[in-house]
Amino acid sequence: MIVAVGIDVVLVERFTRALARTPLLADRLFTEAERYTRSGNPRSPESLAARFAAKEAVAKALGAPAGLSWHDCEIVPDPDGRPWLTVSGTVAAAAVERGASRWHLSLSHDGGIASAMVVAER
């Protein structure tokens, strides 16, 4: 049963400027596994913007409670290389309160816009 849906869009150029303006922002928003590909290459600005949109979408699905940690919502590749959403800590606790135990994630980026949609299920 679906308990929540969240969606968010990010302007890639604006996000890229924010990362350039605030050097530690990427470390604050993303885990190392999110910032780099499996082969150790830095992720593209489009990929990071889509992952940030996913984190925002998760927060929206949970009702945007205060105190969520960005690192407690992680988008990493599954064994086939597709983006996979994992939650822990503050985000997992908020998910339990909301009755969410399974997540579905879709990421996209095109035309300078990154987007993400999440569906939370019981």
UniProtKB/Swiss-Prot annotation:
Pfam families: ACPS. Its EC number is 2.7.8.7. GO terms for molecular function: holo-[acyl-carrier-protein] synthase activity; magnesium ion binding. Transmembrane segments: none annotated. Its main location: cytoplasm. InterPro entries: 4-PPantetheinyl_Trfase_dom, 4-PPantetheinyl_Trfase_dom_sf, ACPS, Ppantetheine-prot_Trfase_dom. This is Holo-[acyl-carrier-protein] synthase. It comes from Salinispora arenicola (strain CNS-205). Its cofactor is Mg(2+). The keyword Cytoplasm applies. The keyword Acyltransferase does not apply.
